[in-house]
Design a protein with these regions (language model features):
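Short beta-strand-initiation
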Residues: 38, 133-134
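Conserved Rossmann-fold dehydrogenase catalytic segment
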Residues: 29, 57-67, 88-104, 124-131
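Oxidoreductase and adenylate-handling cofactor-binding alpha/beta cores
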Residues: 47, 72-94, 106-117, 159-167
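Short, acidic/polar N-cap/turn motifs at the starts of alpha helices
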Residues: 9, 95, 136-138
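N-terminal helix-loop segment corresponding to the beta1-alpha1 unit
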Residues: 1-79, 83-89
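Aromatic-enriched alpha-helical interface/lid elements that frame and gate functional surfaces
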Residues: 135-177
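Short Pro/Gly-enriched beta-strand edge/turn motifs at strand-loop
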Residues: 117-123
């Protein structure tokens, strides 16, 4: 669109050689989806984020923060900061292209790495960080609100058990990996 309006990176850099031109797309500048419309939910679905967490029977609606802000804006901002630094040093601007799918996929490397090692099961609610561990989850309270519990480390889990009076031996062990 910007190129059609005469405001593309080449047009603008002809006016200012130090210009840093940033643009963000969902799918990237090239490839089969480069001209397809989409939204954050589409981008993070394609890279596997919706399959990684949530209830076992369905993906949970995502926070748009993952695709739009985490996978898109933050990566674009980092690229632009590096380009500003380079433009100041060398006098040459550059074009920073950021695709939300690429940035979102990089945010998923923790899950992809653990899955590749057999340390993370593909079934939701069967892993420590996806609702499968009773000590890292959310629970409804008696007033209809929710509380989040995140007692992963042994010392915090021990304190949680002591404070709520959880003495059943079944709850004395922390999560162990499936391997």
């Amino acid at each position: 669109v910007m190129e059609r309006l005469g405001l593309g990176p080449d047009d603008c850099k002809a006016i200012n050689k130090k210009l840093v031109y940033g643009r963000m797309t969902g799918w990237g500048q090239t490839g089969s989806l480069s001209h397809a419309a989409g939204h954050d939910i589409n981008y993070i679905s394609l890279i596997g984020a919706l399959a990684a967490i949530g209830p076992a029977d369905r993906p949970m609606p995502p926070l748009n923060l993952v695709g739009d802000f985490g996978g898109g804006a933050m990566f674009l901002a980092m690229g632009m900061c590096a380009a500003f630094f380079e433009a100041e040093r060398s006098g040459k601007g550059q074009v920073i292209d950021c695709a939300m799918t690429d940035g979102s996929a990089s945010l998923m490397t923790f899950f992809f790495n653990f899955m590749a090692q057999g340390l993370y099961k593909p079934q939701r609610e069967s892993n420590m960080l996806d609702g499968g561990a009773h000590y890292y989850n959310t629970y409804e309270t008696s007033d209809g609100k929710f509380i989040s519990i995140g007692s992963i480390e042994p010392q915090f889990y021990k304190e949680l058990r002591e404070r709520i009076g959880l003495t059943d031996k079944e709850f004395c062990l922390l999560y162990t990996s499936p391997s």
